[in-house]
Structures are given as structure tokens and as C-alpha cells.
Amino acid sequence: MSKINNDWKEILEEEFEKEYFIKLKETLEEEYKNYTVYPPKRDILNAFFLTPYSEVKVVLLGQDPYHQRGQAHGLAFSVNYEIKTPPSLVNMYKELQDDLGLYIPNNGFLEKWSKQGVLLLNTTLTVRDSEANSHSKIGWQTFTDNVIKSLNEREKPVIFILWGNNAKSKEKFIDTNKHYILKGVHPSPLSANKGFFGCKHFSEANRILKNLGEKEIDWQIENKEI
């Protein structure tokens, strides 16, 4: 895993020294040696590199990384440029079109959001090839719980977007006297029609940011020239 060089450094290095994380690292060494694991090691902490602690405005919580070759690059819901946009993200784009009138882009690369203060955080940061949730019990949940707790300690408000039961289980770590929670159904094709479409969480997040005197998120992902 690459070294963090922004203001997450102090927070995360404290985690890295804890017993559970030392065990997690040992497990990962074995997993990467014996199986095909995503994302590439250098990308595991990508979300933290791209969105410094002090600049987090919105946390968009995912579950575990995409588990097919070339998809995952350390940002929840995002895929590399040359990869077909996955179904959940297609549904997010449909909601953005309906909510904010944005066009649906030809790629699923969400780094633009990260650079504006949207922490695209999965609750589990690695996965075996073709085995969803295969790393959900190796220690990542403790790590991401502590990341959420550290953001909760901030005085500056954070908007937490929690879709699906896995994300909503983190609600208990968030003080709603200071912070904001937008929660609902997961954008997966299995559940999107049960309340994800029409949730308007993207415009609602911007409305909150505007009221806080913060710059709104430009949610439009641009087309990539092919």
C-alpha cells in the first residue's frame, strides 16, 4: 500500500499500528500472493489520496470493490476509463439526469468527484477476483468504521450518503447534530426501483452545501474522447 502524504496521514498511521491492522496486512500479503485480488495494491487507499481529510464535504459509501479484472481502482462506484460502466453506476447516472438534468457520460471514471471533496469510500477495500464480499471479514470493516468515526469528530459538517443496508449500518457512528445523513435504497438493479430512483440525493447534497456556504459539487462526469 502506498504511503499517504496529506492530512489523512496522522489518522491512518495510527490505525496502521493497531493489532487488527497488522493482522489485516498479513492476510493481504497472503491473499495477493495466492489469489488475484483487486484493486492493485497501489490503489487500495486511492480515496484518501484524492480527497484529503480537511476537504471532505460528502462521503459516498460503497460496499466492496468491483471484482472483475480492470474495474476497481480504489474509489467506490468508479471504474477505469476503458471499462464498461457497471449497472449500479448506470443507475446513478440515470438519477443524476433526472435530478439535475445531466447527460449520461460514456465512462465511469469518478475521480472528478473525489477532487471536489467527495470521499468515495468502500466499507471493504479489497476483494478476490469474481468473489464478491470475499474480504468483508478480514478487518476492513474495523478500519472504515474508524475512518467514519474520525470524520464524525470534525466540527465542519460532512454529508454522509448511505445507500443500502451495509452503508446504513454505519449510521450509528454519525452525530446528526453536527453532520447530515442522506439514506436510501442501493442503486443496484436489484433494488433501484424500490426508492433509489427519485431520491434526489445529489441535488439535496448541493442544497445543504449551498446553505453551509460551501461550493457545490459539479456532479457532471464528462464524456471521454474515444
UniProtKB/Swiss-Prot annotation:
- The organism sits in which domain of life? Bacteria
**Which InterPro entries is this protein grouped with?**
UDG_fam1 (IPR002043), Ura-DNA_Glyclase_AS (IPR018085), Uracil-DNA_glycosylase-like (IPR005122), Uracil-DNA_glycosylase-like_sf (IPR036895)
Q: Does the keyword Iron apply?
A: no
List, in alphabetical order, the Gene Ontology terms for molecular function in this entry. Answer: uracil DNA N-glycosylase activity
Q: Which UniProt keywords apply?
A: Cytoplasm, DNA damage, DNA repair, Hydrolase
What EC number(s) does the entry state? 3.2.2.27
Q: What Gene Ontology terms describe where this protein resides (cellular component)?
A: cytoplasm
Q: Which reaction is the catalytic activity of this chain? A: Hydrolyzes single-stranded DNA or mismatched double-stranded DNA and polynucleotides, releasing free uracil
What Gene3D superfamilies does this protein's entry cite? Uracil-DNA glycosylase-like domain
Q: Where in the cell is it found?
A: Cytoplasm
The UniProt entry annotates the active site at: D64 (proton acceptor)
SUPFAM superfamilies xrefs: Uracil-DNA glycosylase-like (SSF52141)
The answer on whether this UniProt entry bears the keyword Ribosomal protein reads no
Q: Name one GO biological process term.
A: base-excision repair, AP site formation via deaminated base removal
User: Which coarse location class describes where this protein primarily resides?
Assistant: cytoplasm
Give the family from UniProt. Belongs to the uracil-DNA glycosylase (UDG) superfamily. UNG family.
In terms of NCBIfam families, this protein maps to: PRK05254.1-1, PRK05254.1-2, PRK05254.1-4, PRK05254.1-5, ung
> Its function?
Excises uracil residues from the DNA which can arise as a result of misincorporation of dUMP residues by DNA polymerase or due to deamination of cytosine.
Q: What is this protein called?
A: Uracil-DNA glycosylase
Which species does the entry assign this protein to? Fusobacterium nucleatum subsp. nucleatum (strain ATCC 25586 / DSM 15643 / BCRC 10681 / CIP 101130 / JCM 8532 / KCTC 2640 / LMG 13131 / VPI 4355)
